[in-house]
Curated annotation (Swiss-Prot):
Extracellular side: 21-587
Species this chain originates from: Ovis aries
Similarity-based family: Belongs to the Toll-like receptor family.
Protein name: Toll-like receptor 2
UniProt-listed Gene3D superfamilies: Ribonuclease Inhibitor, Toll/interleukin-1 receptor homology (TIR) domain
Amino acid sequence: MPRALWTAWVWAVISVFTEGASDQASSLSCDPTGVCDGHSRSLNSIPSGLTASVKSLDLSDNEITYVGNRDLQRCVNLKTLRLGANEIHTVEEDSFFHLRNLEYLDLSYNRLSNLSSSWFRSLYVLKFLNLLGNLYKTLGETSLFSHLPNLRTLKVGNSNSFTQIHEKDFTGLTFLEELEISAQNLQLYVPKSLKSIQNISHLILHLRQPVLLLDILIDIVSSLDYLELRDTNLHTFYFSEASISEINTSVKKLTFRNVQFTDDSFVEVVKLFNYVSGILEVEFDDCTHDGVGDFTALTLNRIRYLGNVETLTIRKLHIPQFFLFYDLSSIYPLTGKVKRVTIENSKVFLVPCLLSQHLKSLEYLDLSENLMSEETLKNSACEHAWPVLQTLVLRQNRLKSLEKTGELLLTLKNLNNLDISKNNFLSMPETCQWPGKMKQLNLSSTRIHSLTQCLPQTLEILDVSNNNLDSFSLILPQLKELYISRNKLKTLPDASFLPVLSVMRISGNIINTFSKEQLDSFPQLKALEAGGNNFICSCDFLSFAQGQQALARVLVDWPDGYRCDAPSHVRGQRVQDARLSLSECHRAAVVSAVCCALFLLLLLTGVLCHRFHGLWYMKMMWAWLQAKRKPRKAPRRDLCYDAFVSYSERDSYWVENLMVQELEHFNPPFKLCLHKRDFVPGKWIIDNIIDSIEKSRKTIFVLSESFVRSEWCKYELDFSHFRLFDENNDAAILILLEPIDKKAVPQRFCKLRKIMNTRTYLEWPTDETHREAFWLNLRAAIRS
């Protein structure tokens, strides 16, 4: 018994592990190219069952704690492995040994307290390695990256426990495109630790304090192109001229991101610009200046320029003591070589005239998302301000008058590109003054409703997108590019107004269609973006859009941007894919064909009616319906005649001179109903026939060739037949006045043919000796 229990327990454990492995493997989603996604699946281990077909594996943001030697051994073709944001604390020595094709490895934000070079010894082609955010204090006891000759991007360190950088740490690395070191609590930097790297394109350095910054800078200044300093408090930074002045530097760009300055530390940074002579571009992003701009004039007098800095970018600069800030006149002389300045979202409301005049080399100025108005712009763009300025960006400021803005900028003789978008101009005056060399103007998102002659005729590029324009009727003879998207235009502009236009973006309007003729009218048009409009997919438009292969080379957002809005059955479909029926595309031809078919049908119907007595059948049907409306059987007291006599006019002599004499003068006499004598004058013939038959006990049909040719006799026969079959009585008496061949009876006399086949009839004898018997039989038939 215990043996059986032990066996059951073992099988249960195996079953649990098998089900767990199966569930984890099924939690991955893999596409045919071998890209497997296991991101955020609450996995606690690497799924089993991975094969050589897997080329990219994303297991980030899970709860994996351990990477074993066998977990990835079959993934020999794996190129990308993401294990970031897990709980990994242990990686076995040979976990990555079989991943010889691995190019991208992310182990960031786990719980690794020790790093081993054995992990990477077979990763010869690895290009990207991210080890950020783990718990290690150093980069290991041996050279961690010596087996990674092709590594181009490396990210190491953490914000708390990483405190030391040693000389061996980066041995074996010669060239890196990007190196990120997160060392907010760095306490030890061994000189020349970064010296072994011969070239670093971009170094991102997280330092909380600047104590070791200069030591690091000394090692990399000759091999670094771009230094980015993040999350650093530079209040205590001091630049030692002797440390760096004689070194041949290669740094081209310097970025300060989320860095704090004081007035004194800013002066030290400016000194750095001057001595690290290779710096061409400086960027301050989301920085804080804890000072009032009191830059000691004596200190700055020794610095003639901001080194060779040509581009200065300032974004989101915070100045807590903004209202105590100095006029910055002490730094004016340093700005003479600067060519490009961007000061964005920093509450700038004025550029002093004197500073503008000192910016003698400035070609590009961007003051976006600030507080500039016409009143302050007047002082900033004073006489001799920005003498060589070509591009001015005043996007999203507080400008309100287009006329005044243009007038204030007349001092900028070389200005050719002006961006005043996202200001609230609302309207445009009829005339304006602009600098004489204006070629580009951006008026997008300014809420203007119409365009006037205010725009300069020298424009080559105009952007008026995202406004309230419903038409474009300006003559701009030099305009090459027009951006007029997200307005209310219903059609393309007239090409005669824009003779040299080569680029037009007019998406997001209410244009229903455009034609080949319209596009051909723009002789130099090379790019048209017209998607996002409500196209009516008419036959002509679809024929043009789908039949012009060259159209795809002109329409930059073809085919996905072009959707049908009408007709309803193709709404939402791409214009390229929409199909209309033959009746929609050739309506006139279809209507003509239908009319012709109807005419032929009517003509054929007329011919058939004439040939087969169709009119006669319709009259008979009408009479039949009239008869149906009459009571089925008249009461006995309403019977006025013994018999109604139906005969042809050609047989009237026999009826009136023989039959009437024999029946009405017999004793007792029979009362006959004859149409000549008893029909009510003025009453419709059909009604007379119906009434007479219904008021007679019997109906006598005098059959002859003439009877067969008579339509009225046919009606009388039909109504009698109606009584005969619908009322189940013997009302009909047939008298064959002359021999009639049944086959000769016309088809329309179907009832006569039927009666002659089913009932007996009296035949008028040619032998006078038999006539007495004829009359006797007739009287008996009437009485029955």
